[in-house]
């Protein structure tokens, strides 16, 4: 929730910078679809939006009462300006001639400005390295991470045509804000730093694992287990492979190093769920997305440490198992209808329950839990 609130605050700041305003007619359009390149056009229309261009759809009310034509574009009373306008309601719509943009990598962007400062929100699909050129002038270039709560100077270079080239590395399915700051509250450019000394320690001691269903489920949960790995492939027990609920995993490890500048617990990957981490009784936060890494520097201590990880997955596996059981033996109750055969139609698959042939999905933590300590700070905190 905090991540979403921070993103929405920045995405509500200033005014949007958009490329295209499209009038799609007065018919209620169902949806806009896209391929793996994100922007493809409107269902039933031959319009295809070139990659790298942002667009909004405007209706007749906007065109008649709010929008004003400015050259080839539109301007709205709230300050939003669209450089190009196109009527795509015709049977053979024609877009204005748009310069081709060099867009590389599976990512999307949103641009907002207040006239002095500019904010670009970048989100990737898979691993993505984003490189883009912007006229920054004398402004500083910063990376704001709404997930890690960090703010640091970006890596940039000047191009031959007087623009600023910014390179941003995004984690798997991750995001970042690139801020061109023209105010007094700036982050100083990165100085040449001493190489950080990373140390990695795998937490190899066994885990005591307890299982719990949601309080509404009255069935008895699986008994306590001792595991070396926290992935469900480490067991062949039918009841555990289809478990849906919360696993409380407790282990210990010894740390003999000096007090680090930074310390992270790397969970590798949490399948089909989230992980809440406590170190020595200190709440270190919730890992719910890549890079599945939490800051534990304030909780880590020399000597013996206790770690507790509460892993909660979705109901999917239990629902798949229950559709294979007689109704009297099912743990869950669902308003969805179960099916005996695989469903070929994709809308049926989305809007119905599971079938007996559906495969379970992985759960738990993939790989070893690793403690990463850093002797020199990787980035300034603010």
Where are these regions (language model features)?
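Residue-level detector of short, conserved catalytic/binding motifs and their immediate flanks
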Residues: 18, 118, 263, 275, ...
């Amino acid at each position: 929730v905090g991540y979403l609130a921070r993103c929405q605050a920045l995405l509500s700041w200033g005014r949007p910078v958009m490329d295209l305003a499209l009038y799609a007619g007065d018919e209620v359009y169902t949806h806009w679809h896209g391929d793996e390149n994100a922007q493809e056009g409107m269902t039933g229309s031959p319009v295809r939006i070139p990659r790298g261009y942002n667009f909004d759809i405007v209706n007749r009310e906007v065109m008649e009462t709010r929008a004003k034509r400015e050259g080839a574009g539109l301007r709205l009373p709230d300050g939003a300006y669209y450089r190009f306008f196109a009527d795509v309601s015709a049977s053979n719509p024609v877009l204005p001639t748009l310069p081709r943009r060099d867009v590389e990598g599976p990512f999307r962007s949103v641009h907002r400005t207040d006239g002095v400062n500019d904010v670009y929100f970048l989100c990737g699909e898979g691993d993505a390295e984003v490189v883009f050129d912007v006229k920054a002038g004398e402004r500083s270039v910063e990376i704001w991470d709404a997930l890690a709560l960090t703010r640091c100077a970006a890596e940039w270079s000047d191009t031959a045509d007087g623009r600023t080239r910014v390179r941003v590395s995004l984690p798997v399915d991750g995001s970042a804000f690139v801020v061109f700051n023209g105010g007094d509250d700036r982050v100083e450019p990165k100085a040449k730093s001493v190489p950080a000394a990373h140390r990695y320690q795998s937490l190899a001691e066994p885990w005591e694992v307890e299982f719990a269903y949601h309080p509404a489920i009255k069935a008895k949960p699986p008994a306590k287990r001792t595991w070396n790995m926290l992935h469900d492939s480490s067991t062949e027990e039918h009841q555990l492979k289809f478990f849906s609920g919360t696993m409380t995993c407790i282990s210990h490890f010894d740390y003999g190093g000096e007090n680090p500048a930074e310390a992270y617990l790397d969970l590798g990957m949490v399948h089909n769920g989230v992980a809440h981490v406590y170190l020595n009784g200190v709440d270190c936060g919730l890992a719910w997305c890549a890079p599945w890494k939490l800051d534990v520097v304030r909780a880590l201590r020399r000597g013996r440490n206790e770690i507790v990880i509460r892993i909660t997955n979705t109901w999917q596996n239990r629902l798949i198992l229950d559709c294979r059981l007689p109704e009297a033996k099912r743990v869950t109750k669902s308003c969805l209808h179960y099916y005996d055969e695989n469903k070929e139609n994709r809308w049926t698959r989305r809007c119905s329950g599971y079938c007996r042939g559906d495969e379970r999905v992985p759960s738990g933590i993939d790989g070893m839990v690793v403690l990463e300590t850093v002797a020199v700070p990787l980035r300034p905190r603010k």
